[in-house]
Amino acid sequence: MRHALGSARRAGAALVAALTWAALLAGCSSVGSGGLDLDRILGKPPAPEDAIRITPDDGGRDVRPGTRLRVQVPGGHLEKVRVTRSQDAQDYPVPGRISADGLTWKPDHERLALAARYTVDAVALDSHGRRSARHTTFTTLVPDERFIAYVTPENRSVVGTGMIVSLSFSREIADRAAVERAVHVTARPPVDVRPHWFGASRLDFRPQRYWKPGTEVSVELRLRDVQGAPGVYGLQYKRFGFTVGRSQVSLVDAAKHTMEVRRDGELLATVPVTAGAPKHPTYNGKMVVMDMLEVTRMNSRTVGFGGEYDIPDVPHAMKLTGSGTYLHGNYWAPDAPGRVNVSHGCVGLRDVKGGSSGTPAGWFFDRSLIGDVVEVVNSKDKTVAPDNGLGGWNLNWQEWTAGSAVD
C-alpha cells in the first residue's frame, strides 16, 4: 500500500519549524495506529493510538452472520457512523444508532447478511476536540459449495470514462471459461467490451479505449448453478447497470509538481501537487479513482513502513490503487505542492485542516467521479501493475484480450 505523507502545521518558533520540515517523509495509508507524533512536538496531549475501534476487523473474510458489528471509541464521542451492505452491485444502508454516551454504535438488527460486503465509515472527536476517521470493509460468509461475485461499480451509478467493470469472486475459479461465458457486459451505443482474468478470482471488463460520455453499460451475471470449481456452483442471477458521465482525465507530472485537469479534452485547470519523495516515488501510469472519502485516517504501519506518520483526518481522499495510493488533500505540508515531492507515493494537493471546497484539493474532489482517470508521468518508479486497483488501462488491447479464458 502507498500513501501520501507530510510534515505538520507550521509554528512560529524556529525549532518547531525545523522539526516539522525534518518530518517531511510523507506517506499514505488508511486505518491503523502509531506514527509521527506531531501533536507531541507541538506540545499537545497525545491522541489515543486506536481512536476508533471497529469489529469485525478491516479486511475480514467469511465473517459469520452471528458476529457482532460494533464501532467504539474509548473516550470523546462518535460524531458520525455510516454503514452500508453491498450485494450484487447494490448498496443498502445498515440502520443503527449511537449510544447516549457517544461511545458506541451498533446496528438495529444484529445478524449480518450472508454473502455481502460491509463498508464502515466512522468519524469521532476525542476529549480534546480533535477529529479522526476510519474506513473499513469486511465480507461475510458465503455458504459452502457456492460462490458469488463482488461487483464494481455500483448499480445505477454515474462514473468517469475510465471505469472498468471488475468482478471479485468469493472462491477461486477453476473453470474460468464457464464463468466468463456466464457474464455479459453490453453497452449502448454499442462498443466491443472484452474480459481479462487476473489470477483465479478476479475478472475485469473494458473497451479498447475509454468509454464515451453518455454510454449506458449493462452487466448481466448468469452465474446461478454455473460450476466454477469442482462441486462449487454460482449463486447469482442478476442484472445491473451504470452510466458514463462526462470525460475527465488528469495528468500528474511528478517532475513539474503539477496536475493538468482536462474536461472533455479541454484544459480545465493546472493544479500544484506534491508527489512521492525520491525514496518513495509515485507509480507512473494510468490509475482510476476507486473510492472517494471526505476524510480518512492514514497510517504508515498499514503500508509496510515504520511509525513515520499517523494522520487521523486526511481530507478529500481519492483512492487510486488497491495497494493504497491516494490523491488527497495535504494541510500539514502547505509549501510542498508545486515545489517539492515529499510523500510516500501519494499525490497531495493543498488543503486546510478539516477540508474546504475553496482549496485546490476541495475544488478537485467536488469535480471528480469514481471512474475518472489520473495518469502519472515523469516519476522515478515503475508503471503501476494492471491488477493494482483498476489499472487495466496500462495494458494494450492485444495484451488485454489475451487475458480471456475463452478461445
Q: For each predicted feature, which ranges?
A:
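Extracytoplasmic/periplasmic, Sec-exported soluble proteins
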Residues: 61, 110-113, 157, 161, ...
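Exported/periplasmic cell-wall-interacting domains
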Residues: 161, 300-407
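Short, charged beta-turn/beta-strand-edge "cap" motif at the junction between a beta-strand
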Residues: 124-126, 223-225, 265, 295, ...
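Gly/Pro-biased beta-strand-loop elements
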Residues: 231-338
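Soluble periplasmic/extracytoplasmic beta-strand elements of cell-envelope proteins
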Residues: 53, 70-72, 119, 166-168, ...
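Acidic, low-complexity Ser/Thr/Gly/Pro-rich repeat segments typical of extracellular/periplasmic
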Residues: 2-25, 29-246, 273, 404
